[in-house]
Each structure stands twice: as C-alpha cells, then as structure tokens.
UniProtKB/Swiss-Prot annotation:
Compartment(s): Gas vesicle shell
One Pfam family linked to the record: Gas_vesicle
Family: Belongs to the gas vesicle GvpA family.
Encoding gene, per UniProt annotation: gvpA
Name by which UniProt lists this protein: Gas vesicle protein A
Subunit (UniProt): The gas vesicle shell is 2 nm thick and consists of a single layer of this protein. It forms helical ribs nearly perpendicular to the long axis of the vesicle.
GO molecular function terms noted in the UniProt entry: structural molecule activity
Entries under PANTHER family matching the protein: GAS VESICLE PROTEIN A1, GAS VESICLE STRUCTURAL PROTEIN 2-RELATED
Claim: Nucleus is one of the keywords in the record: no
Organism listed in the record: Thiocapsa pendens
Length: 66
C-alpha cells in the first residue's frame, strides 16, 4: 500500500509541476434566472501558472509594461 501512495504523490507532484510550467486558464460563466428574470450573472477567468510562465506569455501578447 505504501508503494501506491508514493506513486500517487509523485504523480500529483508531476501534474502540479506541469500545470505551473505550462499554465492553465479556467473560464466560467454562470447565470441564475427565475421565471425568465435574470437574478445573478457571474463571469470568472482564473489563471494558474508560475510567475515566470505568466510573465513570459504576458510579454508575448503585450500585457507587460516595457
């Protein structure tokens, strides 16, 4: 059982390392309405990446200040 736990944690570490290295963007849009009347609308964009990865891509698309 200890071998499986060790493998699982190293796999999780590899996944987290890859996400921080490559980055991931989660786009969410939620709308709550009742009888055709919109009560709540939420839009969210979550970016998960290392600072180095973010700065590299932000510079490539012109989001950083020169």
């Amino acid at each position: 059982a200890k071998v499986a736990n060790s493998t699982d944690s190293s796999s999780l570490a590899e996944v987290i390392d890859r996400i921080l290295d490559k980055g991931i963007v989660i786009d969410a849009w939620v709308k709550v309405s009742l009888v055709g009347i919109e009560l709540l609308a939420i839009e969210a964009r979550v970016v998960v990446a290392s600072v180095e990865t973010y700065l590299k891509y932000a510079e490539a698309i012109g989001l950083t200040i020169p």
